[in-house]
């Protein structure tokens, strides 16, 4: 067995499989990890680990740029975005780029610019990643002490945490500045069916912003996912950005308190588990937001929410049958409840039929027809506008239900379009990835705690069959 020439480079977990495969000192015998353990080989090589992370960022940004350009190349302006399987252009449109009244795309050039900028950025990151992975110093502590670190150094770790928090705060303020000063963002609630507007009257009242956190997560309340005006969303980003930046400064200037030093595990794997746990929470919240919220994720770009498509179907048939002479205020359905309209448990007038369970829905095309006690019968008889009929018919046939083979929409709706809503994709992918990240959090937390407690033995490798087999190479 080769001698360990640097104790700093050895991290004790035995995973002997193929000890002959050496990669410039990043082999199993010098690190304790085989090649397939990936970045675990670099736990104590801050320079190489930097290269791995920068290269990873390059791959992420390359995907964003390439996928962005792919969507631009395939985009058909005459069709809604959600019918074209797009997941990136809706985000750009929501930020107010390239769209006009009603969410109509009037200019695709900003989308092209976005893709090109991401591609160029990915090239810079890719170069930096390759440089630090192959050519740069193995460890940063000696040459660049500011960027160097030891995982056990609690003070340095909280400083790094602080820097990350400040960067997140700056990111939150970028959205604020876009909404306030740089052209505004798309507001699905703008009169007449949505438009891009500057957000001038921010909600900064802490009772409103933090009131969302205290709401019940169940129907009618909906926790933070129930936010339905952009003033609250942008005001929330002012609060969040400020908290992140102030918290970042705090963590840079202070050392961890004694209780934190005792309570937390201070190792690279522990920090990995904390991060995975946080990302899992983000994934679950994003899943709920994209599935239920049609303000942060406007239906013009992402397609209707499930409740929205269901209510749209009830509204469409109310309009049709009312024109054919039905008295929608008193007609009885097959169950004896109102066929078109009924009362909610708390007395509001709501749509009848199966969609009664979605009576919580708020949507820009429906709210003008509500009065102080729910849906207003006189408005339903006299005030329905053509744009509301068109939009509800469109949403009725584009329910965000579907399978991987693209058989989309409500199974019983004969006019449903064969597509899968980006809402389905984004909600499902974030739920699944959030779950995987949560499992990763549990796994790495367990390993980190075991290592800290001193009973991390690994498997006894002395008599493992694979050790007596001929090496693959």
From Swiss-Prot:
Q: How does it sit in the membrane?
A: Multi-pass membrane protein
Could you list this entry's UniProt keywords, alphabetically sorted: Acetylation, Chlorophyll, Chloroplast, Chromophore, Manganese, Membrane, Metal-binding, Phosphoprotein, Photosynthesis, Photosystem II, Plastid, Thylakoid, Transmembrane, Transmembrane helix
Q: Which GO terms describe its molecular function?
A: chlorophyll binding; electron transporter, transferring electrons within the cyclic electron transport pathway of photosynthesis activity; metal ion binding
**Primary site of residence:** plastid
Give me any GO biological process, just one: photosynthetic electron transport in photosystem II
Protein's cellular compartments: Plastid, Chloroplast thylakoid membrane
Q: Which residues bind [CaMn4O5] cluster?
A: 367
Name the domain of life: Eukaryota
Post-translational modification N-acetylthreonine, affected residues: 15
Give TM segment ranges.
Answer: 69-93, 134-155, 178-200, 255-275, 291-312, 447-471
Indicate the residues removed as propeptide on maturation: 1-14
**Gene Ontology CC terms:** chloroplast thylakoid membrane; photosystem II
Co-factor: note? Binds multiple chlorophylls and provides some of the ligands for the Ca-4Mn-5O cluster of the oxygen-evolving complex. It may also provide a ligand for a Cl- that is required for oxygen evolution. PSII binds additional chlorophylls, carotenoids and specific lipids.
Gene3D superfamilies, from UniProt? photosystem ii from thermosynechococcus elongatus
Q: Phosphothreonine (modified residue): where?
A: 15
Subunit and interaction comment: PSII is composed of 1 copy each of membrane proteins PsbA, PsbB, PsbC, PsbD, PsbE, PsbF, PsbH, PsbI, PsbJ, PsbK, PsbL, PsbM, PsbT, PsbX, PsbY, PsbZ, Psb30/Ycf12, at least 3 peripheral proteins of the oxygen-evolving complex and a large number of cofactors. It forms dimeric complexes.
Function description: One of the components of the core complex of photosystem II (PSII). It binds chlorophyll and helps catalyze the primary light-induced photochemical processes of PSII. PSII is a light-driven water:plastoquinone oxidoreductase, using light energy to abstract electrons from H(2)O, generating O(2) and a proton gradient subsequently used for ATP formation.
Member of which family?
A: Belongs to the PsbB/PsbC family. PsbC subfamily.
Q: What is this protein called?
A: Photosystem II CP43 reaction center protein
The upper taxonomy is: Eukaryota, Viridiplantae, Streptophyta, Embryophyta, Tracheophyta
Gene that specifies this protein: psbC
